[in-house]
From Swiss-Prot:
Residues 577-587 have a biased composition (Low complexity). The lineage of its organism: Bacteria, Bacillati, Actinomycetota, Actinomycetes, Micromonosporales. The keyword Translocase does not apply. Belongs to the heat shock protein 70 family. One of its GO terms (molecular function) is unfolded protein binding. It comes from Salinispora arenicola (strain CNS-205). InterPro entries: ATPase_NBD, Chaperone_DnaK, Heat_shock_70_CS, HSP70_C_sf, HSP70_peptide-bd_sf, Hsp_70_fam. SUPFAM superfamilies: Actin-like ATPase domain, Heat shock protein 70kD (HSP70), C-terminal subdomain, Heat shock protein 70kD (HSP70), peptide-binding domain. The modification Phosphothreonine is found at T175. Keywords: ATP-binding, Chaperone, Nucleotide-binding, Phosphoprotein, Stress response. The gene is dnaK. Residues 467-508, 567-611 are annotated as: Disordered. Residues 480-508 have a biased composition (Basic and acidic residues). It comes from the Bacteria. The keyword Chaperone applies. This is Chaperone protein DnaK.
Length: 611
């Protein structure tokens, strides 16, 4: 049976895990790290760079490096690179393809099935877009799972049959949510979830960047925010400073040659204390309180009844965040899980559940936001309340607002506001062909169906005529199937192109190495070779130098093979020649030792013990 992987597709970093012998294993990437930066860059030569290599070149290539794209998922955002528009789905797919390649390299087999996680507070459009990113990357997305739910699954699977209440506080690079779950006898039931999709570690970084820009402007009168390369350096420095301040009381941010003024190059040197950092980010910390209180209220659980608190996301390592969670819950967070990896581990376990590898586990998730339609007066009429366990199906009968109304326009929204326009519009469809009738007479049944991925289907039916209309809510950002297929093919072509580039680089490296070794061999031993062999090597060496000066890889391969052959022959000749010389020298030495009778000494061996 083909393996399935679990993927935490994060704002800042991503992680992939797989079940091995029933136990989840986090897969290290090609660079040896257990997490991969969610950064994609388009090099000038057309190569697509992902992860650590993309991060390393960001300073010199700021316009073509995309990070934190998860914040744009489910929107109409796009980026232009070389006159081509890339959607958030396509950029996310590049990161997923990198994780897929690394997993396949580790496992030694093709991987197609995956469970991908999303923030619990993602709406329908964002979930659809994440699923599409997986499809573009070549995955069959088995399930979209909420990150806190995956974390609870990873944490709670081995906790036995005792019923317990768990609070998951998930503060990642770009999103934040809080979930309350009940765990008992293999059943993991989400009671409530709340969050903020625009709050995360990136915002803490931005405060440091703003502080550095303001400080530098005050000292030198130069606004670094207008310099893209400088801003990339500030971004990296801010992230490092934030991490340092989790362990140290101060952090020195030193960036030489950050820009140039009238008098010459200028350097940035700022010391930031933890107290100062916490003061400038206090309002961000305060924004975590609202979703926490909402989740507790919706679950109908007292804070005192929460038995375990799990921290998820790298941003929870900040001391101020840990202290906030301790203050809100009255207990120390659990230290037994890795906040960077626990979500991917849970996703791998859920993949195991779906594949039948993990038994006796039932995951009951919820929809994070209420779903409904717009009715007369612009009112938002809810059909499915937030925190309803999914999958679920609800129906309600509506009627017309005007006499002889020939059709009904059904506008689907997701959110909590009473006025429909203030909520997130998911889609619109029309039920036509209604027979003339006074208002209030037609009976139109509207049914909402949410699947286990949290993706919505809506169905409207005129009970009088039997006419019906269906739609899968695709939101404004979702892509038509043909676009997904086209993007998947593009991604595959890029993968082939990247593979070809790697092979070309390896061929060139091997050829250059052989060239150097041969030149060294000639310098050290060329005078010992027969003239014919030396001429053959020089001729082959010249052909390889010429080939390396061009771009024809086949020519380089051919010249490399030819030089390898003649070099090997020459090496064999030299070895044989040296062996013959050594034999001759040995024979001469042996003859010298085997002298005449004058060289013979008569002697007795005396055994001292027998004396």
């Amino acid at each position: 049976m083909a393996r399935a992987v679990g993927i935490d597709l994060g704002t800042t970093n991503s992680c992939v895990s797989v079940l091995e012998g029933g136990e989840p294993t986090v897969i290290a990437n090609a660079e040896g790290s257990r997490t991969t930066p969610s950064i994609v860059a388009f090099a000038r030569n057309g190569e697509v760079l992902v992860g650590e290599v993309a991060k390393r070149q960001a300073v010199t290539n700021p316009d073509r490096t995309i990070r934190s794209v998860k914040r744009e998922v489910g929107t109409n955002w796009s980026v232009d690179i070389d006159d081509k528009k890339y959607t958030p789905q396509e950029i996310s797919a590049r990161t997923l393809m990198k994780l897929k390649r690394d997993a396949e390299s580790y496992l030694g087999e093709q991987i197609t099935d995956a469970v991908i996680t999303v923030p619990a507070y993602f709406n329908d459009g964002q979930r659809q877009a994440t699923k599409e990113a997986g499809e573009i990357a070549g995955f069959n997305v088995l399930r979209i799972v909420n990150e806190p739910t995956a974390a609870a699954l990873a944490y709670g699977l081995d906790k036995g049959s005792k019923e317990q209440t768990v609070l998951v506080f998930d503060l990642g690079g770009g999103t934040f949510d809080v979930s309350l779950l009940e765990l008992a006898e293999g059943v993991i039931e989400v009671k409530s979830t709340s969050g903020d999709n625009l709050l995360g570690g990136d915002d803490w970084d931005q405060r440091i960047i703003d502080h550095l820009v303001k400080t530098f402007n005050g000292e030198h009168g130069i606004d670094l925010s207008q310099d893209k390369m400088a801003m990339q350096r500030l971004k990296e420095a801010a992230e490092k400073a934030k991490i340092e301040l989790s362990a140290a009381a101060t952090s020195n941010i030193n960036l030489p040659y950050i820009t140039a003024g009238a008098a010459g190059p200028l350097h940035l040197d700022v010391t930031l204390t933890r107290a100062e950092f916490q003061r400038m980010t206090q309002d961000l910390l305060d924004r975590c309180k609202g979703p926490f209180e909402q989740a507790v209220k919706d679950a109908g659980i007292k804070v005192a009844d929460v038995e375990h608190v799990i921290l998820v996301g790298g941003s929870t390592r900040m001391p101020a965040v840990t202290e906030l969670v301790k203050d809100l819950t009255g207990r120390d967070p659990n230290k037994g899980v890795n906040p960077d990896e626990v979500v991917a581990v849970g996703a791998a376990l859920q993949a195991g559940v779906l594949k039948g590898e993990v038994k006796d586990v039932l995951l009951l998730d919820v929809t994070p936001l209420s779903l409904g339609i717009e009715t007369k007066g612009g009112i938002f009429t809810k059909l499915i309340e937030r925190n309803t366990t999914i999958p679920t199906k609800r129906s309600e009968v509506f009627t017309t607002a005007d006499d002889n109304q020939p059709s009904v326009l059904i506008q689907v929204f997701q959110g909590e506001r009473e006025i429909a326009a203030y909520n997130k519009k998911l889609g619109t469809f029309e039920l036509t062909g209604l027979p003339p009738a006074p208002r209030g007479m037609p009976q139109i049944e509207v049914t909402f169906d949410i699947d286990a991925n949290g993706i919505v289907n809506v169905h409207a039916k005129d009970l009088g005529t039997g006419k019906e209309q269906k739609m899968t809510v695709t939101a404004g950002s979702s892509l038509p199937k043909e676009d997904i297929e086209r993007m998947r093919r593009d991604a595959e072509e890029h993968a082939e192109e990247d593979k070809r580039r790697r092979e070309e680089a390896e061929t060139r490296n091997l050829a250059e190495a052989l060239q150097w070794q041969t030149e060294k061999f000639l310098a050290e031993s060329g005078d010992k070779l027969p003239t014919e062999s030396r001429d053959q090597i020089n001729e082959a060496l010249g052909e390889l130098r010429s080939a390396l000066g061009g771009q024809d890889i086949e020519k380089i391969k051919s010249a490399h093979a030819q030089l390898a052959q003649v070099s090997q022959q020459a090496g064999s000749q030299l070895y044989t020649q040296q062996g013959e010389q050594a034999g001759a020298t040995g024979a001469q030495a042996g003859g010298a030792q085997a002298g005449g009778p004058d060289d013979v000494v008569d002697a007795e061996i005396v055994d001292e013990d027998k004396k």
